[in-house]
Design a protein with these regions (language model features):
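Predominantly soluble domains enriched in secretory-pathway, periplasmic, or organellar proteins
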Residues: 1-188
Length: 188
């Protein structure tokens, strides 16, 4: 089954075989949503500024925690979720289980927005829309360590990673462009 957050309907749709089979209640303006293995589903509620954890099998809400001053996007790696707290200029890491727990945060001045995970290399990539930058964090150890910064196209809203070679792709709605960065060294 698949899950989709309805940002303007305040629901999470459960989809099987291309059909909505259930609508789960969600907080006001659910934004980013991400699977955590096959057991949990993590959801960012933009307006309520919380992270919810659903049981992906029973569809029940298991836990809720504060997600900062303005969370917008979420990605997962293993049993951890990484959240772009756009208004707080912070990247937050949560351990996801029946009770989500914030385990780390790092400053990301410049309005962090887009976020992507490179699971093979244990990296998190974040776009900074106010400064037109891409920041790379190593998450291989207990801390999130910034290892690279790259200039980007204007208004870098979306980011994704090629899992094969680690190239990072950034999209700009403002510019209507797609930029590719092949990480090497430490960036700038």
């Amino acid at each position: 089954k698949l899950f989709a957050a309805g940002e303007f309907s305040d629901t999470v749709s459960v989809i099987r075989d291309g059909k909505v089979i259930e609508s789960l209640p969600a907080p006001v303006q659910p934004g980013g949503i991400a699977a955590v293995g096959d057991r949990y589903l993590a959801l960012i509620a933009v307006s309520e500024r919380v992270l919810l954890v659903y049981d992906a099998r029973s569809n029940e809400v298991l836990g809720v925690t504060d997600a900062g001053t303005g969370p917008t996007h979420i990605e997962t790696l293993g049993d951890e979720a990484y959240v772009a707290d756009t208004e707080g200029d912070v990247i937050r890491r949560f351990r996801i289980g029946s009770k989500p727990v914030e385990t780390a945060k790092v400053a990301a001045p410049g309005t962090p927005y887009g976020i992507a995970v490179d699971s093979r290399r244990k990296r998190v990539w974040v776009t900074l829309t106010a400064t037109n930058r891409l920041i790379g964090y190593s998450v291989a150890g207990p801390e999130m360590k910034k290892f690279a910064t790259y200039p980007t196209i204007r208004q870098p809203n979306s980011v994704t990673v090629d899992p094969g070679n680690g190239d990072v792709f950034i999209a700009s709605r403002t510019e209507g462009q797609l930029e590719r960065i092949s990480p090497g060294g430490d960036g700038e």
